């Protein structure tokens, strides 16, 4: 605080004291006048009474008696004088002194408020005066401290200037306080005591005592200056100076005391003292930890000593055997007889994985003896065990209490404690990581008491339950395969088996498997116009633009049934043979159920789709024909048959109602029967009348499949449909998921990817070839215009986009040729011809060509009279699959001496997938000049036809063709046989292609 600010604060403080003195003087001085008048009257009355009683005495005796009474009572009883010149106690100076003692918290107590108003005003007055007094004295102490330090620095400077060898001493806390106290004691205690002795007539010791009590704000109040009755008369004007001296001395002595306390506070904040404090606190904590750890260790020692000294010296007496040990069951399996009315017979135990069955049987015949452990304290009978311990009879109660305490303590498992401390591997303990490997309850789920396990896994030799509605789940499948969860696959078989049973029980009944809310909506919202066929369905994006459009009651149900296109009036197939539900083998006549997020199968309607079902999924029309079933129109009932009104009321896809997009888009699901009939009528009318677009008149070419299209009722008039993996009729083909390797799966994905990218280019090539050779001009599709996009390398779509029906998948001919130079497909491509032969040609498969490194002059093969520049392209495959040494899958090896052709363990799907060439091979893409579609091409040439031809690269001649056998595929032998057969039939294929007829590639 600056000196000016402190002076201003001092002026405010003195003014505040003057204000308080005026208030107290006004209140207490008037009250003192009244009290003194009353005392005068009382003194006169007492004097008259005493003189009346002492009337028989002489005057001297009366005066002596009155003086003794006055001295004893400390109040005069003599006759008061006519004029009383005794000074008042509550003068203005004394009122100021009282206010100062209140704010400085000294509180002598010689004078105090005598009225209620004075006491209340004192409380309010001290609330403001005490803080102001503290701030003032703190600033004064800071000023004294700076002055003291300045004097000390000046002294050191003087000493260093006069003595070059002078080194200032490093003063400690105690030395600094003592040095600061010396001038304070001399200035504020010793000298003022002489003044008090002179004016108050006190001894010096009392004056020094008063000075110390006042300076330290103790303020007993037994001695107070300036309150003598004769001091004003005796000292005159010096008494006024004395009164001012008392106030000034009081202020500065308190300020110096604050300075000393500040020095002590600074010393306590030094680094050395902080270090000492830290050391002390750390030692206290360490001592506490040592005490706690020592006590804990001692408790463990005490427990061990009790066990060794007392418990082991007596014979333990156990209680009755627990009822849990008498039950005929094991800890790893539940008690199957607890919920039965009659007790089940004790079954014979069948050991699952054990080599000691004979030993256990022998021990069982001899009788099992349960050995009680000495550590199982909960089974001890406390009274019977310790009552015979004569030497330790005094400790019986103590031992009983200790045993009870130790028996109730259940320490946590060590593994969980370690996992909680160290976190395990990625925060999981060993039991959590290996939870899927346990087929029985974990350690934490056992109930006490726990019997030691004598085996790994076991099961009861119970009679297998007769399942009436589903295939039993023989075990809890925790493992996963690349084809899905075994438990979900098992549940799928159960759902299909239920459908088989329902189909056999109610052949003529109609069963609708819908969601409960959807079925309720369908029953509630029946309307007369339900049989109306919706011609157009507004997409959701456009529907949001019209939020106030009225919503039909059956709209929600129609949207749920419009996921796939369902033909109207089609009846499901006949019931097939039952499943062998005690094995994992699926028969040829069985079907696969379809799971939707674990809810069960969808409605088992029939469709030309690819998912076959026998009451639990989609039904493939082709397999009905293969099984020898009657046509759909001849069947009278099935497991599921939708009503015509309900079937027509559902929402149809915009791709089945608008035939132009449907003709261009390769969809996974076929159009409905109603839309298909309209599309056929339009195509027939356009073909006969010769009007309309050629794209709408052409047959909608669908995306190629890995499997040949099955023969169905609509196969002659529509494009082939993709078959399902579960639609095969061979017993070996049903196990394709378990026998197909990862390499075969990758090759299959490559085939689908390549064929999907080149789908439209194959159609354009077929149409272009027909136009160049004088074929059909009206019925073929229009060729797309060549744009700038064909000059850049194409961006191949991902695998997932193959099933999205993306219509923006357009690649130009030049890009397709460059793509052919990099990839190849095993799917047969339709040659230049009309749309009538496209389905038959697209379903054929061809072996892969040979991949070899050829010279530049050998790769440039020309055909035809035109000489067009050729492009040489040489590339390397950018990816590969790690080869495997397994030529035949495990467990499928034929017997010795058997032929691979006769005894082949490969499925039909694997034989088709094996035709895919090895990704490790390399190919050189030769080119040929453009030519007509009817010109014969030599082996190894490509017909580009102006950049739009889709002709495949033929294998090299036998002399230059290397072997395509690869060790990375288990189907290499079948590939060699297929290539040999193709080599023998190559001349006929070339001759057929040269004549202009469709040739198989």
From Swiss-Prot:
Give yes or no: UniProt keyword Transport.
yes
Q: In which tissues is it expressed?
A: Widespread expression in adult, strongest expression in muscle, brain and ovary. Also present at low levels in larva and embryo.
Q: Which GO terms describe its biological process?
A: locomotor rhythm; potassium ion transmembrane transport; regulation of heart rate
- Chain spans, region Disordered: 591-668, 768-795, 830-1001
InterPro entries found in the cross-reference section: 2pore_dom_K_chnl (IPR003280), K_chnl_dom (IPR013099)
Q: Does the keyword Ion transport apply?
A: yes
Say where the protein is mainly found: membrane
**Residue intervals annotated with topology Cytoplasmic:** 1-6, 141-170, 265-1001
- Tell me the domain of life: Eukaryota
Functionally, this protein is described as follows: Background potassium channel. Rectification is dependent on external potassium concentration. Acts as an outwardly rectifying channel but as external potassium levels increase, this is reversed.
Q: Can you say what this protein is called?
A: Open rectifier potassium channel protein 1
| Organism of provenance | Drosophila melanogaster (Fruit fly)
């Amino acid at each position: 605080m600056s000196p000016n600010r402190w002076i201003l604060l001092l002026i405010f403080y003195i003014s505040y004291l003057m204000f308080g003195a005026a208030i107290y003087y006004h209140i207490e001085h008037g009250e003192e006048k009244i009290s003194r008048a009353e005392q005068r009257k009382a003194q006169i009355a007492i004097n008259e009474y005493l003189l009346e009683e002492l009337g028989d005495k002489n005057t001297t005796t009366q005066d002596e008696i009155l003086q003794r009474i006055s001295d004893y009572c400390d109040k005069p009883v003599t006759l008061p004088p006519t004029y009383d010149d005794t000074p008042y106690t509550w003068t203005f100076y004394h009122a100021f002194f009282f206010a100062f003692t209140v704010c400085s918290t000294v509180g002598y107590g010689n004078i105090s408020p005598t009225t209620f108003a004075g006491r209340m005003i004192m409380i309010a007055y001290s609330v403001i005066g005490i803080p102001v007094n503290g701030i003032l004295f703190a600033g004064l102490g800071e000023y004294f401290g700076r002055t003291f330090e300045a004097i000390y620095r000046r002294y050191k400077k003087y000493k260093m200037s006069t003595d070059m060898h002078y080194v200032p001493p490093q003063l400690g806390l105690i030395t600094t306080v003592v040095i600061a106290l010396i001038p304070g004691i001399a200035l504020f205690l010793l000298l003022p005591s002489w003044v008090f002795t002179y004016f108050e007539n006190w001894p010096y010791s009392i004056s020094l005592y008063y000075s110390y009590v006042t300076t330290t704000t103790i303020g007993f109040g037994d001695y107070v200056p300036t309150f003598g009755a004769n001091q004003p008369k005796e000292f005159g004007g010096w008494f006024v100076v004395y009164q001012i001296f008392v106030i000034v001395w009081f202020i500065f002595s308190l300020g110096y005391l604050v300075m000393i306390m500040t020095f002590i506070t600074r010393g306590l904040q030094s680094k050395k003292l902080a270090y000492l404090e830290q050391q002390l606190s750390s030692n206290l904590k360490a001592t506490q930890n040592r005490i706690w750890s020592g006590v804990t260790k001692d408790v463990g020692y005490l427990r061990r000593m009790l066990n060794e000294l007392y418990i082991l010296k007596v014979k333990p007496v156990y209680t009755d055997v627990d009822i849990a040990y008498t039950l005929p069951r094991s800890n790893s399996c539940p008690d199957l007889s607890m919920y039965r009315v009659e007790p089940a017979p004790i079954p014979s135990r069948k050991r699952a994985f054990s080599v000691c069955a004979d030993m256990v049987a022998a021990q069982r015949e001899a009788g099992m003896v349960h050995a009680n452990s000495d550590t199982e304290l909960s089974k001890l009978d406390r009274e019977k065990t310790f009552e015979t311990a004569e030497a330790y009879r005094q400790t019986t109660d103590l031992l009983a209490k200790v045993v009870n305490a130790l028996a109730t303590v259940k320490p946590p498992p060590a593994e969980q404690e370690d996992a909680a401390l160290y976190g395990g591997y990625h925060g999981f303990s060993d039991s959590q990581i290996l939870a899927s490997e346990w087929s029985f309850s974990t350690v934490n789920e056992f109930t006490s008491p726990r019997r030691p396990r004598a085996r790994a896994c076991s099961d009861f030799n119970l009679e297998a339950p007769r399942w009436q509605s589903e295939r039993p789940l023989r075990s809890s499948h925790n493992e996963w395969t690349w084809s899905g969860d075994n438990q979900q696959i098992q549940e799928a078989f159960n759902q299909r088996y239920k459908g088989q049973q329902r189909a056999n029980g109610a052949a003529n009944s109609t069963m609708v498997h819908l969601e409960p809310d959807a079925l309720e909506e369908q029953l509630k919202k029946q309307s007369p116009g339900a049989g109306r066929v919706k011609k157009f369905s507004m997409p959701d994006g456009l529907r949001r633009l019209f939020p106030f459009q009225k919503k039909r009651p059956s709209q929600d149900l129609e949207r749920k049934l419009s996921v796939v296109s369902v033909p109207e009036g089609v009846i499901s197939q006949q019931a097939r043979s039952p499943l062998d539900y005690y094995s994992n083998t699926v028969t040829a006549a069985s079907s696969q159920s379809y799971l939707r997020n674990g809810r069960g199968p969808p409605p088992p309607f029939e469709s030309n789709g690819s998912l076959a079902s026998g009451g639990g999924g989609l039904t493939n029309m082709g397999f009905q024909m293969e099984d020898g079933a009657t046509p759909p129109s001849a069947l009278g009932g099935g497991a599921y048959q939708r009503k015509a009104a309900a079937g027509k009321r559902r929402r149809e896809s915009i791709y089945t109602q608008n035939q132009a997009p449907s003709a261009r888009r390769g969809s996974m699901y076929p159009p409905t029967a109603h839309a298909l009939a309209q599309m056929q009528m339009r195509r027939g009318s356009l073909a006969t009348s010769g009007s309309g677009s050629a794209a709408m008149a052409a047959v909608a070419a669908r995306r190629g499949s890995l499997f040949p299209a099955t023969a169905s009722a609509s196969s002659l008039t529509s494009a082939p449909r993709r078959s399902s993996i579960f639609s095969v009729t061979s017993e070996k083909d049903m196990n394709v998921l378990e026998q197909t390797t990862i390499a075969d799966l990758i090759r299959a994905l490559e085939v689908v990817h390549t064929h999907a990218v080149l789908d439209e280019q194959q159609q354009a090539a077929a149409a272009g070839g027909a136009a160049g050779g004088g074929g059909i001009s009206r019925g073929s599709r229009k060729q797309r215009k060549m744009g700038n996009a064909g000059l850049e390398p194409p961006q191949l779509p991902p695998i997932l986009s193959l099933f999205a029906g993306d219509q923006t998948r357009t690649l130009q001919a030049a890009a397709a040729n460059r793509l052919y130079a990099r990839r190849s497909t095993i799917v047969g491509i339709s040659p230049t011809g009309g749309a009538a032969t496209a389905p038959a040609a697209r379903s054929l498969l061809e072996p892969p060509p040979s991949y070899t490194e050829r010279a530049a002059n050998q790769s440039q093969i020309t055909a035809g009279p035109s000489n067009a520049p050729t492009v040489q392209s040489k590339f390397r495959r950018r990816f590969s699959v790690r080869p495997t040494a397994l030529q035949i899958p495990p467990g499928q090896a034929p017997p010795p001496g058997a032929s691979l052709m006769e005894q082949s363990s490969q499925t039909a799907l694997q034989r088709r997938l094996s035709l895919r060439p090895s990704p490790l091979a390399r190919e050189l893409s030769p080119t040929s000049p453009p030519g007509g579609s009817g010109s014969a091409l030599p082996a190894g040439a490509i017909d580009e036809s102006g950049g739009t031809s889709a002709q495949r690269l033929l294998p090299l001649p036998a002399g230059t063709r290397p072997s395509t056998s690869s060790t990375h595929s288990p189907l290499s032998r079948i590939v060699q046989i297929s290539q040999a057969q193709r080599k023998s039939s190559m001349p006929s294929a070339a001759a057929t292609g040269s004549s202009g007829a469709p040739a198989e590639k």
